[in-house]
């Protein structure tokens, strides 16, 4: 599915994604530094990705992890620095939230350190009951040299 505005395109076509651009940005982000290209490929295979393009050049990205029934997690959202300030992040979120396959969910979640105001525009807020949420965190699991060999 493609969306067009002012010379930019947002597409859910996985074949258009530039893994090198995505990997380079994520490797320099606060939330995914050190994530391997293979881990990124696998994460995209198992989610609904949204690429943002200026012509054929990828300039942004987001992905949604979902069961397509009740729950969605928005992850890895970015717009390259040279393209920020043009409303692309807001437009990307509009497209994600309104995607026809992502309607009727009881809960959407995401994590951010620095974009709270952007996400508030789309109805996101702090967890109402954070005491109910737990996580299991092993930041180096996928980056072990033999991880994907044992688990594929």
Regions found by a protein language model. Give the residues of each.
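Short amphipathic alpha-helix that is part of the acyltransferase structural core
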Residues: 1-35, 130, 145-152
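Conserved active-site alpha-helix within GNAT-family acetyltransferase domains
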Residues: 102-138
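Conserved acetyl-CoA pyrophosphate-binding loop and the N-cap/start of the following alpha-helix
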Residues: 83-92
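Short helix-loop capping/hinge motifs at secondary-structure junctions, enriched
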Residues: 140-143
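A conserved beta-strand-loop-helix scaffold within acyl/acetyltransferase catalytic domains
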Residues: 38-55, 60-78
């Amino acid at each position: 599915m493609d969306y067009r505005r002012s010379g930019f395109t947002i597409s859910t076509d996985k074949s258009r994604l530039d893994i090198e651009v995505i990997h380079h940005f994520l490797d320099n982000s606060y939330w995914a530094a050190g994530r391997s290209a293979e881990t990124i490929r696998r994460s995209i295979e198992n989610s609904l990705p949204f690429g943002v393009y200026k012509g054929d050049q990828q300039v942004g990205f987001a992905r949604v992890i979902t069961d397509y029934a009740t729950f969605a997690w928005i992850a890895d959202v970015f717009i390259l620095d040279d393209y920020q300030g043009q409303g692309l992040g807001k437009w990307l979120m509009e497209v994600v939230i309104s995607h026809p396959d992502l309607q009727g969910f009881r809960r959407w979640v995401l994590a951010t350190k620095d974009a709270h105001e952007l996400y508030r525009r789309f109805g996101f807020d702090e967890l109402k009951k954070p005491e109910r949420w737990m996580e299991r965190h092993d930041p180096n699991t996928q980056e072990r040299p033999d991880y994907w060999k044992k688990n594929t």
